């Protein structure tokens, strides 16, 4: 059985994910930044990450459950980091408008598979550099947040791995 302190990795992870979500909604509502398709996809993954961590805190599973939750949370955070890295690349690349042709308002007028593809590819709104803080744009902050959120489940998995190696 994993010690209780490994289970407590999920509470700070949940709180940090919720803080990032609140910050993104605050930027939308107070500053007026409208989310692009990649931002919406990242919010969805961030919400999934927060729900996974919250479920892990509430359920307080055994060793196998903790490892499953950690793997799922790590998958969510790495997928979010990949989307954020793509967003950063789109903002820095020249001539990628043909890659992301549809604005967010028309994404859901298409089939579900096409809408999912557009949410993952991004839209023309994804290239705008409307906001920055400490010389980092919002997608760069998202990438940093997802990478930091990946550290918590990764440390849980590594702690379990080193603990099992120490027993043998």
Swiss-Prot record:
GO terms for molecular function: electron transfer activity; protein-disulfide reductase activity. Pfam families: DsbB. Disulfide bonds join 36-39, 100-126. The keyword NADP does not apply. It is found in: Cell inner membrane. Residues 1-9, 62-67, 160-168 are cytoplasmic. It is a multi-pass membrane protein. Residues 27-44, 86-140 are periplasmic. It comes from the Bacteria. One of its GO terms (biological process) is protein folding. One of its GO terms (cellular component) is plasma membrane. Required for disulfide bond formation in some periplasmic proteins. Acts by oxidizing the DsbA protein. Belongs to the DsbB family. This is Disulfide bond formation protein B 2. The lineage of its organism: Bacteria, Pseudomonadati, Pseudomonadota, Gammaproteobacteria, Pseudomonadales. The gene is dsbB2.
């Amino acid at each position: 059985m994993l010690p209780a302190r490994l289970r407590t990795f999920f509470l700070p992870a949940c709180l940090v994910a919720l803080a990032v979500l609140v910050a993104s909604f605050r930027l939308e509502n107070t500053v007026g930044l409208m989310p692009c398709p990649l931002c919406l996809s990242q919010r969805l993954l961030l919400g999934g990450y927060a729900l996974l961590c919250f479920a892990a805190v509430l359920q307080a599973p055994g060793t196998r459950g903790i490892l499953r939750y950690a793997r799922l949370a790590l998958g969510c955070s790495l997928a979010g980091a990949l989307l954020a890295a793509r967003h950063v690349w789109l903002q820095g690349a020249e001539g990628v408008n043909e890659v992301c042709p549809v604005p967010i308002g028309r994404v859901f007028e298409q089939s579900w598979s096409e809408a999912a593809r557009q949410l993952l590819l991004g839209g023309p709104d994804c290239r705008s550099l409307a906001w920055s803080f400490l010389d980092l744009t919002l997608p760069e902050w998202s990438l940093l947040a997802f990478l930091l959120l990946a550290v918590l489940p990764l440390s849980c998995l590594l702690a379990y791995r080193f603990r099992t190696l120490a027993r043998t």
